[in-house]
């Protein structure tokens, strides 16, 4: 699968971007290949849409700043 993969630690309010890193490398660092609701590490598949905006594998938008959504979920800063 082509694309950019991103490993994010949301509990420390920090994020690490791994551009074009091997998927097997990230598999060892995350329990699942999608956002986890109660895990420490989160793995997201990053893909640019036709407008140049980046989206997670579950098609939620990737924001460029921390933000609290209306339902209380925290979005993650991602800048590629």
What label would you give each PLM region?
Residues 9, 18, 45-48:
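Residue-level signal for short segments within beta-strands and strand-turn junctions
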């Amino acid at each position: 699968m082509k694309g950019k993969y991103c490993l994010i630690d949301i509990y420390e309010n920090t994020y690490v971007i791994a551009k074009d890193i091997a998927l097997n490398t990230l598999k060892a660092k995350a329990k699942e290949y999608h956002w986890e609701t109660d895990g420490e590490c989160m793995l997201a598949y990053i893909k640019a849409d036709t407008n140049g905006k980046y989206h997670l594998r579950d098609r939620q938008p990737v924001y460029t700043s921390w933000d609290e959504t209306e339902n209380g979920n925290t979005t993650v800063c991602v800048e590629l």
